[in-house]
Amino acid sequence: MKTDIEIAREAKLKRISDIAKDIGIEEKYLEPYGKYIAKVDLKFLKTLNNKKDGKLILVTAITPTPAGEGKTTTSIGLSMALNRLGKKSIVTLREPSLGPVFGIKGGAAGGGYSQVLPMENINLHFTGDIHAISSAHNLISAVIDSHIKFGNNLNINPTKVFWKRTMDMNDRALRQIIVGLGGNANGLPREDGFIITAASEIMAILCLAKDLKDLKERLGNIVVAESFDKKLVRVKDLKIEGALTALLKDAINPNIVQTIENTPAFIHGGPFANIAHGTNSIIATKLALKLTDYVVTEAGFAADLGAEKFLDFVTQVGNFDVNAVVLVATIKALKYHGGIKKDELNKENVDAMLKGMENLKTHIENLKLYNVPVVVALNVFASDTTNELKAFSEHCNAPHALVRAFEKGSKGTIELANTVLENISDSKHIPILNPEMSIEEKIETLATKVYRARKVIYTDTAKSKLKFLKRHGFETLPVIVAKTQSSISDDPKKLNAPRDYNFTIRDFELSAGAGFVVALAGEIMRMPGLSKIPNAVNIDVDEDGNIVGLS
């Protein structure tokens, strides 16, 4: 089979103005970035207020494995298949981060015959949104250190600066650094560090803001430090929320592209689901809901991460409902959770697959807590055997369909589309987290009901930070749990369906502008590192200027 990039280059793309026109976006609301990419002016969304929302289909997955599950490929294929069936559908996705593109994961534009295009642009710089977020984030850092040097009127305690710097790259060497070295001219030396841009609170804010006014207010509410007299220092105290908004005024407008079969796609924002809320911007989702009958959106990593945060938090902020959830699984992933090593996953092993189905079963049970229909999408690989597929079908305790989007595009996803249409609901999903719950109650609910832990343990650091949050009035903020994506638990080594263990919260981080508290579990890092052999070594440019090795 041809490579992703070869398939992408053979696709017959329409001009983006035609794609936009087909779904009712007037050209005056488009800001083109070449022939095939455009931004949609936020003002257009306001003209659609009286239109009824379409139905929302959330795509998530079982606990990810090194073999890959194909969630984005399935999302794109499902949206294309709905259109092939005569329905109207738009897919909404997150923007890829350069860190994973050059790291172990690779690109995030789908694969095979189920891609969003132009994939090279989308996977690399795209429309510059992530650059704008990085610039805004680092402006805050620069102003903080400048303020401390020139008088420090806000009495900022340099040892209590919470705001780290950022860049859109995996670079473990920057996790902990010292800034201000080299004498008085360079500022006050202090400990600092970098996080990846996808983990920036500004990324979360951009994806949660409903308009420019809301964006500016949220930016102003970011807590960056504590003063010597124990007062919180916010961005609005530094008087730079206007400058930050200026840097982001174009980035807040959603990006429109197309799939390989010319289905419209909004790609906007890219928070990770293991360290943030893990889905594209609310603006992009709301715009899609106003323009089509069926919106397919994706939440990062597994159902215990992205889907939980989407169902408990994102939908509440965005004021929309989920009408069906698609849970992506693979035979390989099930065998991996059943104890089979990565290099042996291509060998038939029905017993291991059935053992690994406990992971699938757990995610199905968790999703049903939200009163939402669940459809399992089994992403089929060439190595899957007839015996394995038969055993899966016999033991899967939810409506399910086989998916071949990678090799057949929409034609390989028709079965899934029909199964979703048969099961989709008009009823409202029910979050399991109540806004009035305390931080501890929210974590306890997630740990016992979703992560299947015995109890929650708080380190001394976490207990101290909890007191800080309560002292400053943040005790009922929504909670985003940052934990490993490789296990339902807080330990990446606990595969399949761990039960009856202690779930440890080691620290908390406040995202007052985004409107949530991050509970850090296990050893999760907000600045990833590159693998021993990163994907970067596979990427090149030929003599004609064509990128090769990107997938």
From Swiss-Prot:
The UniProt family comment states: Belongs to the formate--tetrahydrofolate ligase family.
PROSITE patterns with a match to the protein in the record: FTHFS_1
Keyword Nucleotide-binding part of the UniProt annotation? yes
Which keywords label this protein?
Answer: ATP-binding, Ligase, Nucleotide-binding, One-carbon metabolism
Q: Which organism is it from?
A: Thermosipho melanesiensis (strain DSM 12029 / CIP 104789 / BI429)
Quickly give the catalysed reaction: (6S)-5,6,7,8-tetrahydrofolate + formate + ATP = (6R)-10-formyltetrahydrofolate + ADP + phosphate
> Could you say which EC number(s) this protein's record lists?
6.3.4.3
Q: Name one GO biological process term.
A: tetrahydrofolate interconversion
Q: Does the keyword Nucleotide-binding apply?
A: yes
For this entry, the protein name equals: Formate--tetrahydrofolate ligase
